[in-house]
């Protein structure tokens, strides 16, 4: 490449920095939109070679005086929102994509908010430039000029697509529509990329305003609240001409003057805030519907509805009542509230909408007052009713219905004039007599029905099949013992005891000595009538010590005798011991679940027929329990051995044995 071509390439590099900086600073300023004498970026501008676009700071000379031998630092251009002239009464907020407002600063507490940072550089240190192999003599100046024109067009398009351009257009529209424009401006600044960039007194680009971006997982080196764009670099023998930008995702800044109630931005700022403060206990609505309610020109009228239920004490809970011109009066007089929120701490729909714009409420006021009684000793608060409005409307209704009342009276007179149209009174009296007769017949059937119910209950309760099934289910299951039938059905229990029912199962139980019975556990030896324990009628414990009852003769209706050894340390006494007087009240018809206490010997039986009388012992349950608790050990066994002669329940003197 000749020296002439080198000079052309150096001149193109100088124009690259000059045009890039001028294009960014001009498009990003308000002068581009407001000034009629602003530069038009048309085809002629991109084709011609110019030295100066507009007044640029002197720092730009460092890049426009490039001679091909010196090292050029990166050119940095910052686009920022200038807040120096913003009064202290203004607040700055940022709106995200979900219309949530985030506080930025108040007044001019922060002087700037950095929106974008451009990086324009001549890169000759990167590996892509060093590894690039150019064929022939290199890129000609004509081809390089065409590539740079294409780069500038792409840069101009990119500038109009960034979020800061939308903010600039919004500020310009507000300034044109109002006499007093907001004292904020979008400006640019050219910096030397080799020097450190400080953010003291301003909000830098690396600082996120929306805190929700901290929860986003970011795998790149770019912060979550920023985005980055790069333009394809252009190759020269002196290095790669690069342009890149990092910018904020969200630039919808809102400015509100707290001293002016009718500020143009007050409605835009307060509208999302009302949406967020509405109680969540109300019926779910979309974001657009809530915005329409808050705006006066978008108010819609809904049909009011109410539902009543009784949660704890009688009280009505209604759904949202909205004005409706054609709807009738709601008789429930319920207000729109969240049932679990205090009215002073939550904002309901009644407080978010203007009451003066809703004159069509009849008997119901939309407010945030609790209206039903709870179970926490709170008094019932009635909703406020506009009595004067209701009376006025009733008076108007009466005036409008005078003509209808006259027509109705004429119709009634016409009916009274014809006796055949009047109802007969004799027919109604006959119907009353028939009805009273039916009631009397029904009342006469009640005694017979009651007697039939008692007979049926008696037959079911004394049925032996049901009794045996109940006892078998209790003996083989782990459920608690069921209660026996009432004592009224077993007045003659002694006469129903026959000979087979007095036989004892197994001969081994009859020959057991009385001394072996002494070794058994005191509590388990007691009969259930003395408060003892029936192992087969109780549930299993954590440490089972019971053995299964040996059922060798299932066909015989024998008297069950307990032979189960139980741990001597386990005394399981009944809380309410029964006396022997109540034995007849706890017996079924065909079985006698009676177990002999150990102080009485086993009854003597033979294979032949025998008759026995059953006598009531003189020992009571209270005496036996007190005797067991007072006497223990060997002394107690000795006392038992001394009284063996008085232990019989069945006496053999009354038995009539047949002669062989």
Swiss-Prot record:
Localization (cell): Cytoplasm; Preautophagosomal structure
Biological processes per GO annotation: cellular response to nitrogen starvation; Cvt vesicle assembly; mitophagy; piecemeal microautophagy of the nucleus; positive regulation of autophagy; protein localization to phagophore assembly site; protein targeting to vacuole involved in autophagy; regulation of cellular localization
GO molecular function ontology, one term from the record: armadillo repeat domain binding
Disulfide pairings: none
Keyword Transport part of the UniProt annotation: yes
Ranges where the record places region Disordered: 315-369, 467-516, 572-597
Pfam name, any one: ATG13
InterPro entries per record: ATG13 (IPR040182), Atg13_N (IPR018731), HORMA_dom_sf (IPR036570)
Major subcellular location class: cytoplasm
Biased composition (Low complexity): 321-335, 470-479, 504-515
Keywords of this entry: Autophagy, Cytoplasm, Protein transport, Transport
Function text: Activates the ATG1 kinase in a nutritional condition dependent manner through the TOR pathway, leading to autophagy. Also involved in cytoplasm to vacuole transport (Cvt) and more specifically in Cvt vesicle formation. Seems to play a role in the switching machinery regulating the conversion between the Cvt pathway and autophagy. Finally, ATG13 is also required for glycogen storage during stationary phase.
Subunit relationships: Interacts with ATG1 to form the ATG1-ATG13 kinase complex.
Protein's name in the database: Autophagy-related protein 13
Gene: ATG13
């Amino acid at each position: 490449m000749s020296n002439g071509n080198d000079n052309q390439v150096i001149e193109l590099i100088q124009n690259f920095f000059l045009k890039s900086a001028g294009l960014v600073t001009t498009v990003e300023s308000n002068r581009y939109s407001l000034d009629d004498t602003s530069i038009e970026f048309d085809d002629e501008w991109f084709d011609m070679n110019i030295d100066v676009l507009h007044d640029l700071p002197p720092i730009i000379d460092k890049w426009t005086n490039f001679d091909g031998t010196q090292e050029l630092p990166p050119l940095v251009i910052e686009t920022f929102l200038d807040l120096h002239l913003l009064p202290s009464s203004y607040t700055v907020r940022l709106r995200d994509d979900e219309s949530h407002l985030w506080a930025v600063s108040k007044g001019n507490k922060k002087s700037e908010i950095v929106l974008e940072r451009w990086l324009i550089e001549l890169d000759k240190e990167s590996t892509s430039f060093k590894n690039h192999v150019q064929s022939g003599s290199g890129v000609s100046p004509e081809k390089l000029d065409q590539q740079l024109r294409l780069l500038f067009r792409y840069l101009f398009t990119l500038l109009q697509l960034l979020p800061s351009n939308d903010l600039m257009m919004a500020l310009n529209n507000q300034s044109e529509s109002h006499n007093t424009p907001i004292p904020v401006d979008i400006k640019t600044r050219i910096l030397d990329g080799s020097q450190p960039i400080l953010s003291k007194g301003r909000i830098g680009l690396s600082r996120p305003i929306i805190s929700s971006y901290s929860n986003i997982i970011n795998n790149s080196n770019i912060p979550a609240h920023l985005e980055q764009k790069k333009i394809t670099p252009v190759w020269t023998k002196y290095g790669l001409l690069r342009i890149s930008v990092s910018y904020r995702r969200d630039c919808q800044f809102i400015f509100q003057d707290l001293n002016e109630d009718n500020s143009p931005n007050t409605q835009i700022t307060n509208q999302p805030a009302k949406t967020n403060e509405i109680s969540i206990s109300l019926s779910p609505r979309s974001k657009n519907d809530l915005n329409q309610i808050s705006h006066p020109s978008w108010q819609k009228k809904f049909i009011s509805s109410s539902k009543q239920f009784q949660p704890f004490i009688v009280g009505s809970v209604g759904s949202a009542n909205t004005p409706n011109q054609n709807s009738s009066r709601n008789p429930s007089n319920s207000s729109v509230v969240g049932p679990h929120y205090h009215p002073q701490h939550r904002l309901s729909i009644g407080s978010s909408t203007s009451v003066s714009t809703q004159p069509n409420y009849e008997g119901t006021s939309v407010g945030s007052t609790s209206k039903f009684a709870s179970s926490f000793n709170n008094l019932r608060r009635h909703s406020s009713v506009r009595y004067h409005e209701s009376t006025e409307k009733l008076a108007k209704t009466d005036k409008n219905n005078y003509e209808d009342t006259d027509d109705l009276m004429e119709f009634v007179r016409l009916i009274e004039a014809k006796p055949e149209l009047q109802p007969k009174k004799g027919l109604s009296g006959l119907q009353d007599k028939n009805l009273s007769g039916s009631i009397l017949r029904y009342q006469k059937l009640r005694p017979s029905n009651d007697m039939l119910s008692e007979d049926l209950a008696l037959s079911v309760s004394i049925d032996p099949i049901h009794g045996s099934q109940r006892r078998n289910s209790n003996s083989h299951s782990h459920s608690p013992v069921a209660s026996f039938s009432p004592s009224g059905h077993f007045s003659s229990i002694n006469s129903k005891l026959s000979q087979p029912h007095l036989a004892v199962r197994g001969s081994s139980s009859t020959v057991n000595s009385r001394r072996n019975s002494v070794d058994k556990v005191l509590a388990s030896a007691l009969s259930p009538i003395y408060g003892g324990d029936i192992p087969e009628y109780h549930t299993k414990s954590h440490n089972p010590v019971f053995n299964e009852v040996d059922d060798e003769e299932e066909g015989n209706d024998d008297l069950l005798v307990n032979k189960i050894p139980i741990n001597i340390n386990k005394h399981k006494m009944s809380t309410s011991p029964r006396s022997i007087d109540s034995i007849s009240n706890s017996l079924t018809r065909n079985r006698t679940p009676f177990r002999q206490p150990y102080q009485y010997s086993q009854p003597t039986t033979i294979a032949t027929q025998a008759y026995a009388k059953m006598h009531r012992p003189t020992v009571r349950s209270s005496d036996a329990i007190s005797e067991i608790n007072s006497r223990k050990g060997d002394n107690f066994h000795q006392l038992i051995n001394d009284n063996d002669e008085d232990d019989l329940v069945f006496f053999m003197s009354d038995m009539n044995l047949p002669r062989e």
